[in-house]
Amino acid sequence: MEERSQRRKKKRKLKKWVKVVAGLMAFLVIAAGSVGAYAFVKLNNASKEAHVSLARGEQSVKRIKEFDPGKDSFSVLLLGIDAREKNGETVDQARSDANVLVTFNRKEKTAKMLSIPRDAYVNIPGHGYDKFTHAHAYGGVDLTVKTVEEMLDIPVDYVVESNFTAFEDVVNELNGVKVTVKSDKVIQQIKKDTKGKVVLQKGTHTLDGEEALAYVRTRKADSDLLRGQRQMEVLSAIIDKSKSLSSIPAYDDIVDTMGQNLKMNLSLKDAIGLFPFITSLKSVESIQLTGYDYEPAGVYYFKLNQQKLQEVKKELQNDLGV
């Protein structure tokens, strides 16, 4: 049915894009706030370890004019990778389980976040129509970027890839994040999910990493829409907390974690340059694609509503000024 939510029989994992954004925000905060030779050297080493170059070069082919990262609106593709060593997969062979494109409008000081369903039925250049998640398995980050650019007809300026081990650490390094818990059903479901390890109370509280993780991952208490709102609440809390450099008491462990678990074409210079703008954002809006379940020959896909896709394309193009 049109507009029906994408459903799977297997247990869904945590919305991993929250972790990716958390890691990126922490990187930007620490990059901008580092002082002293030791701090700079440590962060610079982590940045070099995390840095990857795209085969296309620094600028997207979708950019007609030369891209000025200090002045132009820009986009960041956030990828959450499920690389399982037990299957002998390398990171490039793994599928992308979380796929979020974020556009940043310089003039308006706003951001828009678009989650791309992993099972979306899209054209993967050189491979034909398949699940979006397979683009990464076929050609790593380069092919994933090409697929997004063709699908949305916009430039992907930066890409950040994570294997999701740092969420709890990031929240804990921020000394927790403030969240308002409203639902008794959510409280009871979290208690059940964690077998009593996490017990929340109604009201506004500062959640540690384990509590925040439980809050964003529980899925049986309410709808997908309300779960998405909880995830956006935590993400917004992370961004707000990250604006205060004093909220990070020690960065050694988190910098090490980022170096090992993030891959990006952002340099340390890029990160420091972007920090003031990102932390001055007036709003972060979440936009959504729609579609329906599609199962030719018994294989599940999520077929996108083409009218909605065209609307999203235009919205993102306007946001980037392309």
UniProtKB/Swiss-Prot annotation:
Belongs to the LytR/CpsA/Psr (LCP) family. Residues 1-19 are cytoplasmic. It comes from Bacillus subtilis (strain 168). Its EC number is 2.7.8.-. It is found in: Cell membrane. One of its GO terms (molecular function) is transferase activity. The keyword Transmembrane applies. Disruption phenotype: Single mutant has no effect on cell growth or morphology under normal growth conditions. Triple disruption of tagTUV genes is not viable. Keywords: Cell membrane, Cell wall biogenesis/degradation, Membrane, Signal-anchor, Transferase, Transmembrane, Transmembrane helix. Residues 41-322 are extracellular. The chain crosses the membrane at residues 20-40. Pathway: Cell wall biogenesis. Pfam families: LytR_cpsA_psr (PF03816). Its main location: membrane. One of its GO terms (cellular component) is plasma membrane. NCBIfam families: lytR_cpsA_psr. InterPro entries: LytR/CpsA/Psr_CW_biosynth, LytR_CpsA_psr. It is a single-pass type II membrane protein. This is Polyisoprenyl-teichoic acid--peptidoglycan teichoic acid transferase TagT. GO terms for biological process: cell wall organization. Interacts with MreB. May catalyze the final step in cell wall teichoic acid biosynthesis, the transfer of the anionic cell wall polymers (APs) from their lipid-linked precursor to the cell wall peptidoglycan (PG).
